[in-house]
């Protein structure tokens, strides 16, 4: 039995510009108008229709809750002149669009985390020392910094791999950078929470001394359900307190959505094939 005041949310995996697959999945689900729609980040990039995808999700208004992913932030960084387009990027059409400024502003005002009814959604993951309250505090710090007038300077300072582990003594840019990397980049960490940023295979491909972030011993968010995307090689994974949503649509696999519920046994999975959304090899 669920406790959601409205319809339980439907959470979507990484769209990455796969607009046709998203439309097929949405039409298959046919959600009621009061159903909240959650998106685990990476709405854009590498798929063939980033502009159409972003416009459609933005047009959902408050019904859509989309956390920021690394590709969404790459879009902001390119728009700000901090980074340049890379081979395989498909965000140029957004930057060239007549409504580019409005779309960039919409992305810039998305959250890094969303918490509701014991469910915490982020794009990539969390560090083991963080409980839900600290994760939300750090997400709020990042969100406020990215929404401020000097957001370009802030975003520039967030890129980098160091420090790669949490300490309550971290301050200013170092504190924000660790949070930024955990929310949007992490896959593997040491049992103590030191992040590794190169490996992107499945759990069996963990570098020596590392493990999936969600298997870190004593992880303090084990008392809530974490909903996340980012990790295509992990694929769709449902545990009692985990919902991993990225099933690699942009790589020609599947796009997944999960109708969430307080009772894990009541979750409902819907998937569509993504043959028409194949990105070039990294």
Swiss-Prot record:
Reactions the enzyme catalyzes: P(1),P(4)-bis(5'-adenosyl) tetraphosphate + H2O = 2 ADP + 2 H(+)
Enzyme Commission number(s): 3.6.1.41
InterPro entries: ApaH, Calcineurin-like_PHP_ApaH, Metallo-depent_PP-like
Pfam families referenced in this protein's UniProt entry, alphabetically: Metallophos
GO molecular function terms attached to this record: bis(5'-nucleosyl)-tetraphosphatase (symmetrical) activity
Enzyme class name: hydrolase
Keyword Nucleotide-binding applies: no
Keywords linked to the UniProt accession: Hydrolase
Family: Belongs to the Ap4A hydrolase family.
Purpose of the protein: Hydrolyzes diadenosine 5',5'''-P1,P4-tetraphosphate to yield ADP.
Name of the protein in its database record: Bis(5'-nucleosyl)-tetraphosphatase, symmetrical
Underlying gene: apaH
């Amino acid at each position: 039995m669920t406790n959601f005041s409205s319809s339980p949310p439907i959470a979507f995996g990484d769209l990455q510009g796969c607009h046709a697959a998203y439309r097929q999945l949405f039409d298959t689900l046919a959600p009621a108008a009061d159903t909240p729609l959650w998106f685990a980040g990476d709405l854009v990039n590498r798929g063939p229709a980033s502009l159409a995808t972003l416009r459609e999700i933005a047009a959902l208004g408050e019904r859509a809750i989309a956390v920021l992913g690394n590709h969404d932030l790459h879009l902001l960084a390119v728009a700000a002149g901090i980074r340049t387009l890379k081979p395989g990027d498909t965000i140029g059409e957004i930057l060239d669009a007549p409504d580019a400024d409005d779309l960039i502003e919409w992305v810039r005002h998305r959250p890094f985390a969303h918490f509701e009814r014991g469910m915490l959604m982020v794009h990539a993951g969390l560090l083991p020392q963080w409980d839900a309250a600290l994760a939300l505090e750090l997400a709020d710090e990042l969100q406020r910094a990215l929404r401020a007038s000097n957001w370009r300077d802030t975003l520039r300072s967030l890129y980098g791999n160091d420090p790669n582990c949490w300490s309550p003594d971290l301050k200013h840019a170092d504190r924000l950078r660790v949070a930024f990397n955990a929310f949007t980049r992490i896959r593997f960490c040491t049992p103590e929470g030191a992040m590794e940023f190169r490996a992107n295979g499945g759990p069996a491909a963990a570098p020596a001394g590392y493990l999936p972030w969600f298997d870190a011993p004593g992880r303090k968010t084990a008392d809530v359900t974490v909903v996340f995307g980012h990790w295509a090689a992990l694929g769709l994974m449902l545990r009692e307190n985990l919902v991993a949503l990225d099933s690699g649509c942009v790589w020609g696999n599947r796009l997944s959505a999960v109708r969430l519920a307080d009772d894990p046994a009541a979750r409902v999975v819907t998937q569509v094939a993504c043959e028409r959304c194949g990105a070039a090899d990294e």
